[in-house]
């Protein structure tokens, strides 16, 4: 009977070689895995915009118009005020009933104004997953600051639901020619249920600020204050006009809990009325280059605060996603031609998309 062959052990050099090979394989595979995950997140983001587009078109089929931008940034959606001029909430609230979020839309329905103010606290703290880009943050409430709310009590800790998507406010500047056509906190609480009574609703000059003439002159997008836009008003064609797209957000604010006014327009609830938290613009071909630079779509980063309240952008590399007024979803390059992008924001400029 022969003696057994001695088992040969790994040498230290061989072990180090194996570890090095494994390290190289991980280094090669990890970027591919990360890229695949980001591609999946970006695709999910596109699906969210598809849902928003379809919900908006379903609302249009039901009511005859797109959702209005609401009354102002201190008002949230009211379940007893329909979806037209009488609705103080913004586009995000208007489409809830068509996004499998009917329960959130109906919070406080039929209650007295005082009881409803308490009930709507729940609405403000109820995120809709489709309003969040998974490349940026999960669907959860985050700090919004101690803001005044006209028709609702603030949630505990001032933690609101947010939105990563913004309606198309147009290719005009929010404030032009010195006219007061920018943002408003909206009318006083007395307006609820009494719109458009001048005695009840002209607080903060609301009715004088957002007249039909001023809307037609200064607001050429598809989501505007007070007045819902009809598809027939989109004279440039629904396939040539942005409905909603990803908004730029400084990455410092993804989950920051200590900011107040320094928020780059991410400090109000998703369902509030017209505000640059939920509206952005395409004025990238403005005559003044400094003004135009504010509106250039930009990838999220932790340094760009200039123009952060008015520009579109995303957490994706190279592109941001947008849904058009026909419900289609497109990925738009950050290198998009300035004139072309500006035209995509106007509902009736008559210009041909290059």
Please annotate each region the language model reported.
Residues 7-41, 51:
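N-terminal single-pass transmembrane signal-anchor helix
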Residues 1-12, 73-76:
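N-terminal leader/signal peptides at the extreme start of proteins
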Residues 35-354:
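Internal low-complexity, small-residue/proline-rich segments
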């Amino acid at each position: 009977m022969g003696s057994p062959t001695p088992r040969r052990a790994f040498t230290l050099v061989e072990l180090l070689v194996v570890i090095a090979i494994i390290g190289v394989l991980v280094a090669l595979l990890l970027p591919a895995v990360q890229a695949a995950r980001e591609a999946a997140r970006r695709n999910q983001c596109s699906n969210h915009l598809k849902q928003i587009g379809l919900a908006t078109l379903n609302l249009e089929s039901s009511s005859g118009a797109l959702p209005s931008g609401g009354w102002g940034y201190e008002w949230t959606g009211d379940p007893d005020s329909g979806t037209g001029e009488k609705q103080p909430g913004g586009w995000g609230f208007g489409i809830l009933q068509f996004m499998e979020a009917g329960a959130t839309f109906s919070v406080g329905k039929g209650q007295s104004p005082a009881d409803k103010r308490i009930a709507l606290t729940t609405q403000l703290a109820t995120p809709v997953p489709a309003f969040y880009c998974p490349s940026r943050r999960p669907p959860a409430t985050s700090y919004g600051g101690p803001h005044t709310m006209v028709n609702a009590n603030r949630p505990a800790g001032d933690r609101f639901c947010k939105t990563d998507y913004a309606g198309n406010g147009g290719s005009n500047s929010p404030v032009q020619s010195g006219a007061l056509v920018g943002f408003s906190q909206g009318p006083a609480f007395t307006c609820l249920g009494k719109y458009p009574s001048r005695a009840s609703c002209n607080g903060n000059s609301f009715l004088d600020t957002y007249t039909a003439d001023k809307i037609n002159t200064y607001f050429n997008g598809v989501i505007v204050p007070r007045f819902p836009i009809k598809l027939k008003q989109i004279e440039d064609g629904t396939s040539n006009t942005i409905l909603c797209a990803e908004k730029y957000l400084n990455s410092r604010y993804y989950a920051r809990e200590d900011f107040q006014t320094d928020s780059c327009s991410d400090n109000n609830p998703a369902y509030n009325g017209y505000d640059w938290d939920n509206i952005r613009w395409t004025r990238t071909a403005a005559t003044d280059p400094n003004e135009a630079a504010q509106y250039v779509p930009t990838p999220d980063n932790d340094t760009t605060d200039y123009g952060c309240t008015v520009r579109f952008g995303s957490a994706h590399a190279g592109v941001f996603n947008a849904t058009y007024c026909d419900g289609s979803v497109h990925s738009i390059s950050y290198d998009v031609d300035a004139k072309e992008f500006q035209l995509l924001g106007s509902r009736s400029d008559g210009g041909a998309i290059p």
